[in-house]
Amino acid sequence: MFKSGFVAILGRPNVGKSTFLNHVMGQKIAIMSDKAQTTRNKIMGIYTTETEQIVFIDTPGIHKPKTALGDFMVESAYSTLREVETVLFMVPADEKRGKGDDMIIERLKAAKIPVILVINKIDKVHPDQLLEQIDDFRSQMDFKEVVPISALEGNNVPTLIKLLTDNLEEGFQYFPEDQITDHPERFLVSEMIREKVLHFTQQEVPHSVAVVVESMKRDEETDKVHIRATIMVERDSQKGIIIGKQGAMLKKIGKMARRDIELMLGDKVYLETWVKVKKNWRDKKLDLADFGYNEKEY
C-alpha cells in the first residue's frame, strides 16, 4: 500500500521553515538567509520513499504586509491551507509567543485541519524554557502533536517525519520518485542569485531585490550552461551598492551564486549578471507578475 499527503509549513519570518525543508530533502531547494521575508514564493519539497510520498509546501513568513509584494506573500502562505491535509506550525524556541503567532493561530483554528506545533531552534534554549514555551502555545490551541526540533542540527527531525508518515492515508504517488520540487530550474537559479544578494548586502537592499533569468542555454562548444540574469532594484543607490566599487560586489555575488548553481545542475556554468532599476516595483502588480510573483499562485 502506498501512502501520500500534502503538508504545509507555516510560521512567522525567520523561524527556520526553509532550513527544515532543506534538511529533510538533503539538499538546498529553498534559499536561506538571516534576513526576514527571504522566502517569497511557495516551494514544494517532494519527499519520496518506496512506500510514502510527503509533499511539503514551504511558505513565505507570515507578517503584516506593507507593500503589494507583502500582500502576495501572506496570501500565498495562507492559500496552502486549502491544499493540504496537515499543517506544521513552526515557532522558534528562543522567542516568546507574539502577536504574529496569535494572528496565525486564529487562521489555523478557522481552517479546521490538523496542526502540529513544531518548536524549532531547541539547541538555543534550556529545557525548562522549552517546557514553558510548549505550555504557553498549548493554552492557545489544541494541537494534534507538539514536536521540538533543531532544523539546523537535525535533532528530532526523524521523529517528526515518522509522525507524519505514520499518519498518511493511502494515496497516489503524485510525483516521480526522482523529482524533488515543483519549480523549474530557472526559478531555482534566480533564487540562488537572490540569496547571495541577501547575504552580501544590508539595510534596505534585500527587500527591494528581484532576480529575473533572461536566458539559460547550453553552449555546445564549451559544454557550459550560459545564464543571463538581471537583478532588479528600486533605487539608483541600491544599484550602486550591488555593483560595488569597480564591480567588486557584483563579481562576488556572481561567483558565489555560480558555485551553488553548478552544484544543483551538475554542470559548469557561465553566469552573466546585470543590475537594473525599476522604481517601486514591489507595489506594482504588473511588475510583480513579471518578476515571478503572480496572484495565480494562490
UniProtKB/Swiss-Prot annotation:
It is a peripheral membrane protein. PROSITE patterns: G_ERA, KH_TYPE_2. It comes from the Bacteria. Coiled coil: none annotated. Residues 201-279 form the KH type-2 domain. Residues 58-61 are annotated as: G3. Residues 11-18 are annotated as: G1. One of its GO terms (cellular component) is cytosol. GTP binds at residues 11-18, 58-62, 120-123. Residues 3-170 form the Era-type G domain. It holds the Pfam family KH_2. Residues 120-123 are annotated as: G4. It is found in: Cytoplasm; Cell membrane. Residues 37-41 are annotated as: G2. One of its GO terms (biological process) is ribosomal small subunit assembly. Residues 149-151 are annotated as: G5. CDD domains: Era (cd04163), KH-II_Era (cd22534). Keywords: Cell membrane, Cytoplasm, GTP-binding, Membrane, Nucleotide-binding, Ribosome biogenesis, RNA-binding, rRNA-binding. InterPro entries: G_ERA_dom, GTP-bd, GTPase_Era-like, KH_dom-like_a/b, KH_dom_type_2, KH_sf_prok-type, P-loop_NTPase, Small_GTP-bd. Its main location: cytoplasm. One of its GO terms (molecular function) is ribosomal small subunit binding. Belongs to the TRAFAC class TrmE-Era-EngA-EngB-Septin-like GTPase superfamily. Era GTPase family. An essential GTPase that binds both GDP and GTP, with rapid nucleotide exchange. Plays a role in 16S rRNA processing and 30S ribosomal subunit biogenesis and possibly also in cell cycle regulation and energy metabolism. Monomer. This is GTPase Era. It comes from Streptococcus pyogenes serotype M2 (strain MGAS10270).
